[in-house]
């Protein structure tokens, strides 16, 4: 979001997950995951469950690196402690830093709240006009998609945020499906993602299944989808693995790209193919 607001040069450090735009990867990392790399979905779920049941953190903050950066503002989130360092951990460390930075936590549950966070963050960073402009551009793109698919048949779309165990996409994802011209029979707009069974997914009679394992890129999502290909094929639906990390998991301006991607999957005859 900071880069989209034109503040890239002011970004002193990022998390280990920050990979867009490419220059974000060049900044020092101040977090790391304690979950080993290379695990499949079931192994990740098991590792997360074991650590959280023991009250152990899933991420670590590099407070020594933070201390040397002399930052004025720390941007964090409290939407999901499985996805990033907890807000409480960030706040505690911020209070101990010599620069005494302000901390802003972005915690949206809906697409509207994501867009509202753009001017909120921009104001905190001293560029309010950039935030208003970016939010207006995002809203205009969403309205354009909504107009393009208005009146078209709405396929039943199930978004799988995880495949082992199954999680149904929540928060802003059901709204993204609706804006793109689909009907989400299982997602609950503005609510957290939730577990489900294959039987529940089958009973929803989806026309389309979008496989968007949280935090995984397109290649990883395709590999995870292939692991469950037999079960997915039994649904009789079109199955599309997507780049969740880029377009669905992270509450930022690229969610608009995600809506455009969904609209192209659901109604390719009505919307231009999105540019990636």
Indicate where each model-derived feature is located:
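N-terminal ligand-binding lobe of clamshell/alpha-beta domains
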Residues: 1-276
């Amino acid at each position: 979001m900071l880069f989209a607001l034109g503040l890239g040069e002011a970004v002193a450090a990022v998390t280990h997950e920050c990979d867009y735009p490419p220059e974000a990867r060049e900044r020092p990392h101040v977090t790391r995951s304690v979950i080993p790399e290379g695990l499949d979905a079931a192994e990740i779920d098991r590792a997360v469950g074991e650590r959280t049941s023991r009250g152990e953190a899933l991420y670590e903050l590099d407070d020594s690196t933070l201390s040397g950066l002399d930052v004025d503002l720390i941007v964090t989130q409290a939407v999901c402690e499985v996805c990033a360092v907890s807000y409480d951990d960030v706040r505690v460390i911020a209070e101990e830093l010599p620069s005494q930075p302000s901390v802003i936590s972005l915690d949206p549950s809906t697409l509207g709240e994501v867009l509202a966070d753009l001017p909120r963050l921009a104001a905190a960073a001293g560029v309010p006009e950039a935030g208003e402009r970016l939010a207006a551009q995002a809203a205009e793109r969403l309205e354009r998609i909504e107009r393009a698919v208005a009146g078209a048949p709405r396929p039943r779309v199930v978004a799988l945020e995880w495949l082992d165990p199954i999680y149904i996409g929540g928060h802003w994802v059901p709204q993204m499906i609706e804006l793109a011209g689909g009907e989400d029979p299982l997602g609950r707009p503005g609510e957290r993602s939730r577990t489900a069974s294959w039987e529940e997914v089958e009973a929803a009679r989806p026309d389309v299944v979008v496989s968007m394992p949280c935090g995984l890129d397109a290649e990883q999502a395709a590999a995870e989808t292939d692991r469950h290909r037999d079960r997915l094929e039994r649904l009789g639906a079109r199955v599309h693995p997507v780049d969740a990390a880029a377009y669905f998991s992270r509450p930022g301006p690229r969610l608009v790209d995600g809506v455009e991607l969904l609209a192209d999957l659901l109604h390719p005859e009505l919307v231009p193919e999105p540019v990636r």
